[in-house]
């Protein structure tokens, strides 16, 4: 499988590749996905959080932040797998030009900082910034923004404040990994929601919101423009670990097709873009695929001597 993708990249000139990643790239880091066998969308009680609901009343915000308080520790501190590390090596080698991701876990940034996760406040920058061509379409769960003054702050700092304000709740309840969502959300009982104490922006007292694109929100226009520019100038577009079900990602595949940019899809099962690609690799492990691609194109094993 890696052989076919490596040949595809060589045929496209070994440069200016644009990558589009989804939740399937992070499952091997312990972050649950949406549409896999145990994915979020297969759970009967799943109801997406929309911006409208989030703003409609304090009870909805209490429910979100209660879930997030218990679920965040699962996605915080996650380490990169060989998908993230392989893509970073391809970027360093000049093969990959831009990396567009639907993921909010910050692991593509972390790859540029060695790939080892940490739950410390100091690790914030490693999950939220890098010079590795990453463009986060849906935001970053490790950041929180104030809806009044616009201040962006570390989610880990908010976790400390939430746990201090809800000390007894934190002692009484522990998140189970099987219930945690890809964005660090966690299903909690109503009694927890009722007891939840919210905290406000430390600068202006405004409402805090996760710095991610909620269901029904639009990807920021500048981000969309940047992504379109990268895709239209690419030698190829490689979609990794994504079923491309949401239009915010699918539109870039359509743009590549319109521009005559060759498309490869590397993921498990069917996608919404099937039939538009030049190459389809069906795999349950994007990490294994990337290990093979790096070995063939760059001549070394991930984690070994370069």
From Swiss-Prot:
- Compartments reported by the entry: Mitochondrion matrix
Q: Which domain of life is it from?
A: Eukaryota
Family indicated by similarity: Belongs to the sirtuin family. Class II subfamily.
Q: Zinc among the record's keywords?
A: yes
Binding of NAD(+) occurs at 22-42, 102-105, 241-243, 287
Domain (Deacetylase sirtuin-type): residue spans on this chain: 1-301
Q: Which Pfam families match?
A: SIR2
> What cofactor does this protein call for?
Zn(2+)
Ligand binding (Zn(2+)): 146, 149, 201, 204
Summary of the function given for this chain in its UniProt record: NAD-dependent protein deacylase. Catalyzes the NAD-dependent hydrolysis of acyl groups from lysine residues.
GO MF assignments? DNA binding; histone deacetylase activity, NAD-dependent; NAD+ binding; zinc ion binding
Q: What is this protein called?
A: NAD-dependent protein deacylase SIR2rp2
Keywords assigned by UniProt?
Metal-binding, Mitochondrion, NAD, Transferase, Zinc
Cofactor binding mode and count: Binds 1 zinc ion per subunit.
EC number in record? 2.3.1.286
Q: Which organism is it from?
A: Trypanosoma brucei brucei (strain 927/4 GUTat10.1)
Q: Which residues form the active site?
A: 138
What else is on record for this protein? This protein may be expected to contain an N-terminal transit peptide but none has been predicted.
Q: Which reaction does it catalyse?
A: N(6)-acetyl-L-lysyl-[protein] + NAD(+) + H2O = 2''-O-acetyl-ADP-D-ribose + nicotinamide + L-lysyl-[protein]
Q: Can you list the GO cellular component terms from the UniProt entry?
A: chromatin silencing complex; cytoplasm; mitochondrial matrix; mitochondrion
Checking PANTHER family in the record gives:
NAD-DEPENDENT PROTEIN DEACYLASE SIRTUIN-5, MITOCHONDRIAL-RELATED
**Matching InterPro entries:** DHS-like_NAD/FAD-binding_dom, NAD-dep_sirtuin_deacylases, Sirtuin, Sirtuin_cat_small_dom_sf, Sirtuin_class_II, Ssirtuin_cat_dom
Set out the biological process GO terms recorded for this chain's protein: regulation of DNA-templated transcription
